[in-house]
């Protein structure tokens, strides 16, 4: 089997590429073209010699279709993901997340791809109206990012219903782990502590999230890809454990072995009506359809992430907040 992974140079994408190669899968990695010929996090992988790199742009239909030649399965992860920046440049999110997904779906349809695994996000649910959140929970995106991901999800499901394209939609809750951008809360906390800061700058401490280690998430992709009964389905992937951002910061500080104070930084707080107050996953459907369940606990994932960040601090700027 040959697979195409879009967004392969990014956080989850690079872990998925690594995992697929470990399973003996032939992988073509779709990487956004850049003049430096950088392959992003794929440069760090010991298995990079086993990966076929394809440089292009998810917004360019021709390059997307060309990348699908000889491919059986497409894992579509390419997206603009930073929520704060979606307030600054929402059109960029429409072009990448909605139009880019259309390009993937239409190219897959014309190329007779056997399976398409499309990546959603728990952000499309908005603040939980009930918990744990299952796939029947109302969709209520509260940021431009979430709105574009919701639109992309609906496109994917429509291609299944209208054209018979064998699409599955994976909806990961808050994935974390090595290689994640400091725009995400866990690496933000860790790098500030590792930099020796005694006061850690954060936004809303009361919001709760379901934090799922990245290796759990990529194993979920694998399981969904293996099971044809997931075609046409939306499938949540989460740890089924809820923690507030304040408690998360304290847990990380304990694991690092440091005492911290938390300072509320107003620029890190979302607009009031845009804040997602609570997320907690119900992964029953994933277990029933594919047999997937998370193998790594929050604490195990945090320890691995802390260890990795200690060795890779050169990639991060702890004192600069970048949306």
Give short role names for the model-derived ranges:
Residues 1-175, 296, 304-323:
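N-terminal Rossmann-like NAD(P)+-binding domain of SDR-like oxidoreductases, especially those catalyzing
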Residues 47-51, 163-166, 190-201, 227, ...:
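A short C-terminal helix-loop "cap" of Rossmann-like NAD(P)-dependent dehydrogenase/epimerase domains
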Residues 59, 88, 96-99, 143, ...:
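Residue-level signal for the nucleotide or nucleotide-sugar donor/cofactor binding architecture
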Residues 74, 217, 221, 237, ...:
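Non-catalytic, hydrophobic alpha-helical segments
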Residues 150, 175-188, 195-200, 214-215, ...:
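Glycine/proline-rich active-site loop of Rossmann-fold NAD(P)-dependent oxidoreductases
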Residues 151, 155, 159, 189, ...:
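Hydrophobic alpha-helix immediately C-terminal to the catalytic Tyr-X-X-X-Lys motif of short-chain
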Residues 204, 233-235, 246-249, 257-278, ...:
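C-terminal "lid/loop" region of Rossmann-like NAD(P)-dependent oxidoreductases
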Residues 214, 234, 269-293, 304:
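Conserved C-terminal active-site "lid" loop/helix of NAD(P)H-dependent oxidoreductases
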